[in-house]
């Protein structure tokens, strides 16, 4: 798998259609993960929530096929640490996640963490991924991979979004 860091949305424009197509098959298909939504969110830096942020979207390809997208940015988090956060964090968007098919999640996370540790080693001290859905398989995969690396993994509930489960025939 070949990983690439994108620091501008212009470099991602050619992937816009593939991004949204993959989202439809992804572990989490939420409107807050659509290409245009995250591009527009980035243009306003989350409505001004992150004035000192730098884009750090990572894509992974294999044989010219898009395998996964980590829609990230770099900023100092609320604890004062340099961190990689999910685009859309924290107050504006609910239900953020990686964009990857379920079958590719484990190997994508493993390769992503290798890539981030080797390509951006001085740019972050934390992966501060808020607004992940409680049922997201990213949580278990990330915990397993970080544990295997000897990294600290912390999971907390942060202002859960309300929802109402509707019957299938609604």
Predicted regions and their residues:
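N-acyltransferase acceptor-side catalytic subdomain
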Residues: 1-170
């Amino acid at each position: 798998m070949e990983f690439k860091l994108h620091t501008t949305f212009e470099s991602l424009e050619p992937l816009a259609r593939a991004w949204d197509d993959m989202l439809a098959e992804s572990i989490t298909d939420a409107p807050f993960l659509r290409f245009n939504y995250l591009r527009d969110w980035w243009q306003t830096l989350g409505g001004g929530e992150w004035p000192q942020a730098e884009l750090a979207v990572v894509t992974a390809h294999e044989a010219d096929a898009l395998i996964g997208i980590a829609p990230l940015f770099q900023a100092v988090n609320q604890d004062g640490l340099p961190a990689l956060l999910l685009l859309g964090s924290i107050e504006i968007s609910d239900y953020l996640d990686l964009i990857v098919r379920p079958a590719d999640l484990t190997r994508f996370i493993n390769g992503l963490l290798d890539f981030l540790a080797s390509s951006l080693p001085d740019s972050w001290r934390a992966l501060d991924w808020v607004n992940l859905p409680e049922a997201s398989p990213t949580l278990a995969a990330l915990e397993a991979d970080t544990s295997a690396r000897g990294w600290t993994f912390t999971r907390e509930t942060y202002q859960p979004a309300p929802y109402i489960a509707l019957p299938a025939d609604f």
